[in-house]
Amino acid sequence: MLLLPLLLPVLGAGSLNKDPSYSLQVQRQVPVPEGLCVIVSCNLSYPRDGWDESTAAYGYWFKGRTSPKTGAPVATNNQSREVAMSTRDRFQLTGDPGKGSCSLVIRDAQREDEAWYFFRVERGSRVRHSFLSNAFFLKVTALTQKPDVYIPETLEPGQPVTVICVFNWAFKKCPAPSFSWTGAALSPRRTRPSTSHFSVLSFTPSPQDHDTDLTCHVDFSRKGVSAQRTVRLRVASLELQGNVIYLEVQKGQFLRLLCAADSQPPATLSWVLQDRVLSSSHPWGPRTLGLELPGVKAGDSGRYTCRAENRLGSQQRALDLSVQYPPENLRVMVSQANRTVLENLRNGTSLRVLEGQSLRLVCVTHSSPPARLSWTWGEQTVGPSQPSDPGVLQLPRVQMEHEGEFTCHARHPLGSQRVSLSFSVHCKSGPMTGVVLVAVGEVAMKILLLCLCLILLRVRSCRRKAARAALGMEAADAVTD
């Protein structure tokens, strides 16, 4: 690791003075997995010396001990300055130094990018400062993170199912990875890659798909950098087939399975789940072998096989156990236009949306058998954007009338759940709005003052007329006398 003190001699002793009029705030160490993208937030301030608002401000990020005078920066907003070939098109200065921002975007991070980085600002004839003591260290780690796959515990043959794959590493201005799916249950057309921060897959399983693998692949911009997650499909058997028994139980129930065999010599008994031996007996022990599941869980679903074996042969019977449970962990995943960050929203969340923006809502839950999903807007039922994916609601262009409450319902024979989101739709306000409001306020105030003046003049006029009338009557009385 390159130590920070090695950066300090780059510009000579004159650059080591800590001038309080120059400051920069940046995270000391920035970790990023290899091949991924990260945003380095950075803010700075510098004295107003030798420049005005029309003076261009240039910012430069340099690596390690690079000389700002002769070396190439890794990123800059100065179009006349060449950047280093190794970081071209990957490092980008997204902040505006003229507005106090020096934020940096690093895409497709590589092992050789691991180093210290410092910032330099130039504006006018006097502001030329390198923030050597405020450098940050970029730590490039191995990509160990895997995508998350959301799939029902047990699939019903012949019934459509929706599977969601999410890779939870997303920043604004960072490119989205490419998703693809592979598995025996999928046709070749289902394996085409798509670019997003999550992928929604719909397919209809068959009994032959039971115990096969389904894999979600996430590929990044750099070749060879990828992540994947594999799940094993559990497709329920709808009828007794040969030596297989199908059993449905509710989550939390007590279950005791008994394996017994008559044989001579006595057989060795065993209980096997998939390919894993759960328990076994000795030939000289009891002629039965019990397996207790005191509170069955969703993960207990699968094929349990009772095996009996002695030196003369073997037999086995299988039981497919399906654990039924109502919807759990119901939530909504939201993807907004111009925002690549995927949001997980819980019940009661308020969502601020700009008018005209596109919005994609994906309702996700775990249940067995799969819950029936639907959307409502207020009291009105909203049809799904994709009939095969009732949990997906697409709003291509949000309007002001969309303001209100959107609710996803998950209905199930064992219970139902719902999650509601409150939409607040805002329109973009123009720069003249405040001026118009102020002008209207001033006109209203002037009209109000004018009305008050007219009322006062009217009152004074009435009083004068009344006084004159009174004087006239007094004069008439005097003549009569």
Swiss-Prot record:
Residues that bind N-acetylneuraminate: 120
Presence of keyword Glycoprotein: yes
SMART domains: IG (SM00409), IGc2 (SM00408)
Main location: membrane
GO cellular component annotations of the record: plasma membrane
Membrane protein topology class: Single-pass type I membrane protein
Carbohydrate-modified residues: 43, 78, 338, 347
Domain Ig-like C2-type: 147-232, 238-322, 327-424
Gene Ontology MF terms: carbohydrate binding; sialic acid binding
Segments on the Extracellular side according to the record's topology features: 17-434
Organs and tissues of expression: Expressed in bone marrow, fetal brain, fetal liver, lung and salivary gland. Detected in brain, macrophage, cancerous esophagus and lung at protein level.
InterPro entries: Ig-like_dom, Ig-like_dom_sf, Ig-like_fold, Ig/MHC_CS, Ig_I-set, Ig_sub, Ig_sub2, Ig_V-set
Any single biological process term in GO: positive regulation of defense response to bacterium
CDD domains, per the entry: IgC2_CD33_d2_like, IgV_CD33
Family classification: Belongs to the immunoglobulin superfamily. SIGLEC (sialic acid binding Ig-like lectin) family.
Role according to the record: Putative adhesion molecule that mediates sialic-acid dependent binding to cells.
Name of protein: Sialic acid-binding Ig-like lectin 16
Lineage, opening ranks: Eukaryota, Metazoa, Chordata, Craniata, Vertebrata
